[in-house]
């Protein structure tokens, strides 16, 4: 289906990377959109072409209600009153992913989930290129999808957040994957977790092949399941499964051994799961199995994802700053084997999530919890006997450096977004690395 944007009043919301990519997309088509940003001083303002009309400081602008088409950036809530009003007036509101999906003719692999998206998407990109594909990776990983549009592409791999899926309606994926679904971004969704979950599930709606995590109870009745192929991974009853009867878990397809985890660089059950689903995707795409295995054996952690920064004098320092929700902290804790104390750095903006699920884990572990940031005081009350509130990350690292002993593991796995003290999880992780080098 061909979309004609000429003659339409087009408005872009947000001057981040996504917003800039949308401007460039329309300009290439000979169309001049308008753009609004809530900030009075957006960091990308300098990138706005001089001939583009803009408004800063508020979304409550008449332009919204005068538009024919609004392209909304993922950082802006779809549930703002003025946007609800715009929908009621029949104004079309879409994401950059929707624009992208209208342009693409080659296969798309869509990857979403609460945790692990960037790791799996990067694995698949490497496997695809190893297999001879001209593959492009974009989306939530930091490269807007409109920037990777290429007439010569064989394959697109896109990482998708729930925010990006909210206003995406015609994404026809060759393969769609939900890695996992756990509580996150609850403050974004008026109807709570189920609304967040349903948004994630929408990735399957127009997919040919749906890969599902058997450990998550996904109601197939919520998905338009006509003419779909379903592939499962996770538990013993899955198509792709992990057998954990030995110290080194083994990955299977049906009853056939694929890979022993002792052969790979990555560590931790969550990483074994990432490798498992990557094998499922690769097989579904009919990539040569040997290419996939060779890539996965040599794959190392992406920055800020359970990244071992230092391992000296019997002390491990692990940077898991990408942990922005409670489930990812839980996974990180379950991946640590140590005879000493786990010294956990927890804190930031909890996004109204329920951290009480960590209570039982804290009780069973030899652990000291250093809570910092916006919700640090609240988090320190989850397990008061083992917790201490520290104002910021630097003070926490200084304190830990004085208390740490041989055999201990220091883990930055905040379980929260970085808002309040940092611009993003990368800035938080980089400061942690810098502090380790300076203080320890």
Swiss-Prot record:
Membrane-crossing segments per the record: none
Database matches in Gene3D superfamilies: Mur ligase, C-terminal domain (3.90.190.20), Mur-like, catalytic domain (3.40.1190.10), NAD(P)-binding Rossmann-like Domain (3.40.50.720)
GO molecular function: ATP binding; UDP-N-acetylmuramoylalanine-D-glutamate ligase activity
Cellular localisation: Cytoplasm
Catalytic activity: UDP-N-acetyl-alpha-D-muramoyl-L-alanine + D-glutamate + ATP = UDP-N-acetyl-alpha-D-muramoyl-L-alanyl-D-glutamate + ADP + phosphate + H(+)
Pfam family, one: Mur_ligase_M
KW Cell division (keyword) present: yes
Main location: cytoplasm
Protein's GO biological process: cell division; cell wall organization; peptidoglycan biosynthetic process; regulation of cell shape
InterPro entries per UniProt: Mur-like_cat_sf (IPR036565), Mur_ligase_C (IPR004101), Mur_ligase_C_dom_sf (IPR036615), Mur_ligase_cen (IPR013221), MurD (IPR005762)
Annotated pathway: Cell wall biogenesis; peptidoglycan biosynthesis
This protein's GO CC annotations: cytoplasm
Key words, A-Z: ATP-binding, Cell cycle, Cell division, Cell shape, Cell wall biogenesis/degradation, Cytoplasm, Ligase, Nucleotide-binding, Peptidoglycan synthesis
Residues binding ATP: 113-119
Enzyme Commission no: 6.3.2.9
Domain of life according to the entry: Bacteria
NCBIfam families: murD
Similarity annotation: Belongs to the MurCDEF family.
Reported function: Cell wall formation. Catalyzes the addition of glutamate to the nucleotide precursor UDP-N-acetylmuramoyl-L-alanine (UMA).
Name of this chain's protein: UDP-N-acetylmuramoylalanine--D-glutamate ligase
